[in-house]
Design a protein with these regions (language model features):
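Residues at the start of alpha-helices and the adjacent loop-to-helix junctions
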Residues: 7-10, 23, 101
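Bacterial N-terminal signal peptides
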Residues: 14-25
Length: 155
């Protein structure tokens, strides 16, 4: 076999190898950035996250951005998948949550929690047991009303 034929074979094998590596790349390489706004007023009333329900995949990053001052975003300890890293944002700053485990992540704005400022992030498929556990979490009345609406969107 000539040198040119060997070079052509090497190029072809290299291209096939590159395509195989891309096909086998981890899902995190395809992760999305999802923006959630923290607002004083929105479509669902006062003190809201918009959107209040987000469906994400493992590896996605959710960015909670203050559209108005006096908000933060933090995970709810009683509504967080086992092994997931909690997140507690600083007032008036973007809070970033990269989801690493499938399940339901409850989010609250601490200063406005009792006013119903909550959100829900669904990561991957949720088991019936996880959904039942999230529905059983005790929340302040207005937060419970909004969380119930978000939980109804879980599929």
């Amino acid at each position: 076999m000539g040198e040119r034929a060997l070079t052509d074979i090497r190029i072809t094998l290299g291209a096939v190898g590159a395509v195989a590596l891309l096909a086998l790349a981890p899902l995190s390489a395809q992760a999305r950035d999802i923006i959630v706004h923290m607002k004083n007023q929105g479509a669902d009333g006062a003190m809201v996250f918009e959107p209040s329900f987000v469906k994400a995949a493992v590896g996605d990053t959710i960015r909670f951005q203050p559209s108005n001052p006096s908000h933060n975003a933090e995970t709810m300890a009683n509504m967080l998948p086992a092994g997931a890293t909690p997140m507690k944002g600083v007032m008036n700053k973007e809070a970033v949550l990269t989801v690493t485990k499938p399940g339901l992540y409850g989010i609250k704005c601490m200063p406005h929690y009792s006013m119903g400022m909550v959100a829900l992030v669904q990561v991957g498929k949720v088991t019936p047991a996880d959904l039942a556990a999230a529905k059983a979490v005790k929340l302040p009345p207005f937060a419970a009303k909004r969380m119930t609406a978000a939980l109804a969107k879980v599929k």
